[in-house]
Amino acid sequence: MKPLSSPLQQYWQTVVERLPEPLAEKSLSAQAKSVLTFSDFVQDSVIAHPEWLTELESQSPQADEWQHYAAWLQEALSNVSDEAGLMRELRLFRRRIMVRIAWAQTLALVTEESILQQLSHLAETLIVAARDWLYDACCREWGTPCNAQGEAQPLLILGMGKLGGGELNFSSDIDLIFAWPEHGCTQGGRRELDNAQFFTRMGQRLIKVLDQPTQDGFVYRVDMRLRPFGESGPLVLSFAALEDYYQEQGRDWERYAMVKARIMGDSEGVYANELRAMLRPFVFRRYIDFSVIQSLRNMKGMIAREVRRRGLTDNIKLGAGGIREIEFIVQVFQLIRGGREPSLQSRSLLPTLSVIAALHLLSENDAEQLRVAYLFLRRLENLLQSINDEQTQTLPSDELNRARLAWAMDFADWPQLTGALTAHMTNVRRVFNELIGDDESETQEESLSEQWRELWQDALQEDDTTPVLAHLSEDDRKQVLTLIADFRKELDKRTIGPRGRQVLDHLMPHLLSDVCAREDAAVTLSRITALLVGIVTRTTYLELLSEFPAALKHLISLCAASPMIASQLARYPLLLDELLDPNTLYQPTATDAYRDELRQYLLRVPEDDEEQQLEALRQFKQAQLLRIAAADIAGTLPVMKVSDHLTWLAEAMIDAVVQQAWVQMVARYGKPNHLNDREGRGFAVVGYGKLGGWELGYSSDLDLIFLHDCPMDAMTDGEREIDGRQFYLRLAQRIMHLFSTRTSSGILYEVDARLRPSGAAGMLVTSAEAFADYQKNEAWTWEHQALVRARVVYGDPQLTAHFDAVRREIMTLPREGKTLQTEVREMREKMRAHLGNKHRDRFDIKADEGGITDIEFITQYLVLRYAHEKPKLTRWSDNVRILELLAQNDIMEEQEAMALTRAYTTLRDELHHLALQELPGHVPEDCFTAERELVRASWQKWLVEE
C-alpha cells in the first residue's frame, strides 16, 4: 500500500483530534489511517459505530462478499415489526456495507468491476427486501392482489440506468419503474381494493421507506421519472398499460434508457420472463436501425448544452470524453444492431464493449482504450463520491480533496492525475466524434436555431439561463420557462404518436423564436400553449402550423392581440384553416354577402342531416367571427363597421335557422292553409336591443320576438293536421331549439324572447294584430322605449310593413312631456340600482352613470317625446343615426349630437376591445371622464331639468 502523501499526513492529525478516545488510543493499522484520512464519510460512520472499524480490521472486505448481502440483511430485519423499524435497519445496513465498500475501494483491495458489482447488488438487495416486507404488510392490511383466476400478483421493479446495468456509482439516485402483471382485486382483506390502488399505495410506501430522510439518513434517492408519462403518469402500471405505451408512444430516449432495464430480485419467474419478452421488441428492432445515431447525437447535444448552461466544468461524467460518451458509443451499437445480434443485448457496458470488439464494430485498439478509460473514470468518480457520500462528478478545486484523489488514484500529485485524465478523455472524445459527432461545424444561424431547440427540448428550470431569452425581464423569463415546462408535463399526459412528437419538435423552436421576440412573450405563450394542448393529438393541425410559417405568424399575432380569439381557436381548432389565407382572414365578408356565403357553405351538408346542418352553422359563424375580430385587431374595421358585420352575420344565421325549422315543421305538419293563395310564410322575427340597433358585440345575445299573421281558423295541410297558430308556436320553439342546441362547436346564440308581449308569461309567438293591440293598450313606457330599437330581421314584406306601421304609430303617439320624462328617468334609476357597477373605483361602461345606457335612454326619450311632431325620427333603430335625425330635425343641436355620437362610439369601441381581451366591461374610475361628463350634462338637460 502506498504511503500517505505529505498533505494527507498533515491532515491525519486533524482526523486524530476528531476520533473518540477508544479509537484514538487504539493502535490503528496503516490501512485504517489511510481510509480515515481519505474519506470523511468513513470517518463519520466509524465514529458513530466503532464496532464497524473493529469488524473491518478483523474481516477485511472481499470481492465476493456481495453474495452474503441478502442473508446479512435478512438477519438484520428478523426482529423488525413495523415500518419505522424497517426504515432504521435498511439505513444502518446500507451505511455499514457502504463503509466496507469504501474501505475496499480506497485501498484497491478489489477490482473496479467488483466495486461496481457490490454497489449494484447492495442496492438491489435493499430494494427487494423493502419491497417484500411491504408486500406482506400491505397484503395483511388490504388483502392479496389477484388476477381474474385468483392468482397472486407481484410487484415487479425495473432497475434502470446504472442500477440495471450492474454499474451503480458510490453515491447515486436509483431510477425505478414499477409494474404489476394483470388487473384484478385484492382477496382476504377487510375491504376489496383493485390492483391498481393496491400497488399504487404500496409503491408510495416503498418510495418513502427508501427515500425519506430520517436521523439515520436515507437508503437511496428514488427517481420515478423514467416511467411512462413521467411525473404525470401513474406510479405503477399494469403489463398491458406498459405495452400499449411503448408500442404507441415510446420515444428514442426511452429505448435508450430501456437497454439497461433489469428486473430486481427473482428475474426468472413467469411474470419476469413475460415482462422481459414484452419490452424486448421495443428496445431492439428486428432491422438495422441507423436512425439511432441522430437520436443519440441529439441527446448528446442536449447534454452538452446543459453542461454549458449550468457551467459544469471539470465534469468527468457529462463533459467531452466523459463517462456518458462511452455509454453512448456502446449503446449506439446495441440499438442499431441489437435486434439482429443477441450478443449485444447485455445490460452491462464492459461485456458489451468486448462483444463490439469481437464483432469488429470497433477496432481492438479503440475498444481497449475505451475499456481502460471507462475503468479509470469510474474509479475516479466513485472515489470522489466516497469522500463525503456525495453525488458529484465535478473534480474538486480545494487542495485537500485533490491530494486525496491523486493519492487514491496512485499518482504523485494532482497535475499527474489530470494529465492522465486528459489523455483518457481525449481518446474517448476521438472515438465518439468518429462515430456520433456532428458532421459539420454549426453556422451562426444553425447555432441560434439550436438554442431555440434547446429551449424547447431541455426542460430548463426557472433559474436556468439561456441567451435567447436574455432580452426579457427576469419575471417574464421565469414565466416563459415555467410555461414551457408545464406544457411539456401536459404533453406527457396525452397520447401522442411518434409522428406527432416529431412534428411538435420541429414546430416548437420556430414558434418559441417568434413568440419570445415579442415584449409580451409570456402572455402570448400562455394563450398559445393552451391552444396547442387541445390539438397535440391531432397531427394534421400541428403540420399545418409547422409547414405554413405564415399561418403560424398569424396565429401568434392574433393570440397576442386577443385571448378571446385564442380561446375560440383552442375550442374549435377547425378555425386554424382560416389562418392559411391572409386575404380572407383580415377581410371580412361583404355585409350584404353573408346570406349567400352561408347558403353556399350549407350546400356541402346533406339537407336532411340535422346534426351536420347545426354543426355547419356554428362553424360558419365562428369562422366569420374570427375574420371580423382579425380585421378589428388589424384596424381595418372601425367600431361601427364591426357591429354592422356582427349584425349582418346574425341576420344570416336567423335566416338559415328559420329556413331549417320551416322545412322540418312543414315536413311534419304541412303548411298553414292561409298561405295557399299568397307568397311568403306569414312569419316574422323582430330584433330588439343590440340586434335591432345594429350594435351587436362579439358575445351579444339576440333579443327576439316572433310574429305571425295566421287567422284563427287556419289549419295545416299535411297528413298530421294541426291548428295553424299551433304550427307557428312549434316553429318558434324549433327555432329556439336550433339556436340553443349545444354541439361539439357550442351553441349558435343565446336567445332572449322576454321582450314579447306580457314577457315570459306571454305566448312565445304572437299574432300581428295581438302585438299591435298590446302595444297600444297594455305596453309600459319602457316597452315603447324598447320599440325604438326594434326592427324586422326576418319576415314577409307584408308582415314587415305591418310591424313598421305599428312601430311608427306607437312611437308617434302624442305624449305628455313631463310624465314621459319622469317615467324614463325613473326606469333608468331603477336599472342603475339593479344593474349598476358593483366594483368600487371602477366605471361600468354600459350600466354606470354617464355610460352607454344613458345615451340610449336619451335618444329613446327624445324619439318618443318628439316623433309626434317629427315622424321622420322613427326611420332608424340605431342610436348613431337617431342622433343624426335629432340634429337634422332641430331637436338637438348638431354639436351636442356629434359629441354624444363620438362618446357613444368611443365607449362601444372600448367594449369591443375588452371583449377581445376577455375582460369585463368596466375600467378604472378615471377613464373616459370627458365622455362621461358630456353624457351627464346631456342627461341633466333632457331628463332632469324642467
Swiss-Prot record:
Coiled-coil boundaries: none
Q: What does the UniProt keyword field contain?
A: ATP-binding, Magnesium, Multifunctional enzyme, Nucleotide-binding, Nucleotidyltransferase, Transferase
- What CDD domains does the annotation carry? NT_GlnE_GlnD_like
Name the InterPro entries on file: GlnE, GlnE_rpt_dom, NT_sf, PII_UdlTrfase/GS_AdlTrfase
Region feature Adenylyl transferase, mapped onto this chain:
449-946
Alphabetically, which GO biological process terms does the record hold? regulation of glutamine family amino acid metabolic process
Q: Name any one GO molecular function.
A: [glutamine synthetase]-adenylyl-L-tyrosine phosphorylase activity
Catalysed conversion reaction? [glutamine synthetase]-O(4)-(5'-adenylyl)-L-tyrosine + phosphate = [glutamine synthetase]-L-tyrosine + ADP; [glutamine synthetase]-L-tyrosine + ATP = [glutamine synthetase]-O(4)-(5'-adenylyl)-L-tyrosine + diphosphate
Q: Which GO terms describe its cellular component?
A: cytosol
Q: Which Pfam families match?
A: GlnD_UR_UTase, GlnE
- Please verify whether the record's keywords include DNA repair: no
What family is reported? Belongs to the GlnE family.
Entry's PANTHER family? BIFUNCTIONAL GLUTAMINE SYNTHETASE ADENYLYLTRANSFERASE_ADENYLYL-REMOVING ENZYME, GLUTAMINE SYNTHETASE ADENYLYLTRANSFERASE
Under what name is this protein listed? Bifunctional glutamine synthetase adenylyltransferase/adenylyl-removing enzyme
What lineage is on file? Bacteria, Pseudomonadati, Pseudomonadota, Gammaproteobacteria, Enterobacterales
Quick one: which gene encodes this? glnE
